[in-house]
């Protein structure tokens, strides 16, 4: 019984992590992370916007779609973001 309860909780948590909405060329996602709240990715411009829990938003340029897909499926999206996006791609603060 404990095993099935654990799997159910894990499944519910995973479903929350992968919630996304597509609007034209933009993919909008809610993120479960200690710092990130949501992300937005534009498949045409290859720009990714990351919104943090402190309300700050940053736009990262030239993020390949495969990198964004890997970010979305990472076990720890926060760690993946820190290692593979925030320190790799040029960015600017947008709010």
Model-derived features with residue positions:
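Short, Lys/Arg-enriched N-terminal segments with co-localized hydrophobic residues
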Residues: 1-14
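Acidic/histidine-enriched, beta-strand-rich ligand/metal-binding domains
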Residues: 13-95
């Amino acid at each position: 019984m404990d095993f099935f309860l654990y799997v159910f909780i894990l499944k519910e948590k995973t479903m929350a992590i992968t919630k996304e909405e597509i609007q034209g060329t933009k993919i909008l996602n809610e993120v479960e992370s200690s710092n990130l709240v949501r992300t937005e990715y534009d498949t045409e411009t290859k720009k990714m916007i990351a919104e943090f829990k402190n309300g700050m938003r940053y736009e990262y340029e030239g993020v390949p779609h495969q990198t964004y897909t890997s970010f979305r499926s990472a076990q720890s999206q926060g760690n993946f973001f820190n290692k593979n996006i925030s320190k790799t791609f040029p960015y600017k603060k947008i709010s």
